[in-house]
Amino acid sequence: MSRIGKTPVLIPEKVTVDLDGLIVTVKGPKGELKRLMPEGVSFDKKDNTVVVSPTTNKIHSRQRHGLCRALIANMVEGVTQGFSKKLEIVGVGSRAQVKGKNLVVSAGYSHPVEMIPPDGITYKVESNTNVTVSGIDKEIVGNEAAKIRSIRPPEPYKGKGIKYHDERILRKAGKSGKK
């Protein structure tokens, strides 16, 4: 049994969870999330909790047990609080701005890079160098933040580029030169 999968998912007051076979729908104050879960796992809704259990004792069911519990917990957290990822842009002349809903990043290329957000994702820019990606789906928020970071990943010599707010860049020493 999975240690993560054993613990039930608590459902807050303003959240409703609908279980229709393998389709789990979570509705809350921030929105609605729907997800098709993998086979080999069953769901039981008791009072204000959802209990996930494997249908068989095969390895695939046991592997998906903890995964499905974590996915449902992330869905519940997303519709109540939401998720956000912060990025920092480091470097002279590198900056970001929001035009309409789109994010425009100037990162040292000959052209600015425009990012179009998927449904449910919002971009927020503070002081031209701090970007916040927020939404209710943890997976999509993380993917969008990774796409923005991939425009100009941080380089190890001067640390220029786009990095996550809490990311530490491993710095390398430059050439030592002749002595």
Curated annotation (Swiss-Prot):
Residue pairs linked by disulfide bridges in the UniProt entry: none
Alphabetical keyword list: Ribonucleoprotein, Ribosomal protein, RNA-binding, rRNA-binding
Pfam families named in the record: Ribosomal_L6
Keyword rRNA-binding applies: yes
Record-linked InterPro entries: Ribosomal_uL6-like (IPR000702), Ribosomal_uL6-like_a/b-dom_sf (IPR036789), Ribosomal_uL6_a/b-dom (IPR020040), Ribosomal_uL6_bac-type (IPR019906), Ribosomal_uL6_CS (IPR002358)
GO molecular function: rRNA binding; structural constituent of ribosome
GO biological process, one term: cytoplasmic translation
Keyword check for Plastid: no
Subunit text: Part of the 50S ribosomal subunit.
Primary role: This protein binds to the 23S rRNA, and is important in its secondary structure. It is located near the subunit interface in the base of the L7/L12 stalk, and near the tRNA binding site of the peptidyltransferase center.
Family: Belongs to the universal ribosomal protein uL6 family.
Protein's name in the database: Large ribosomal subunit protein uL6
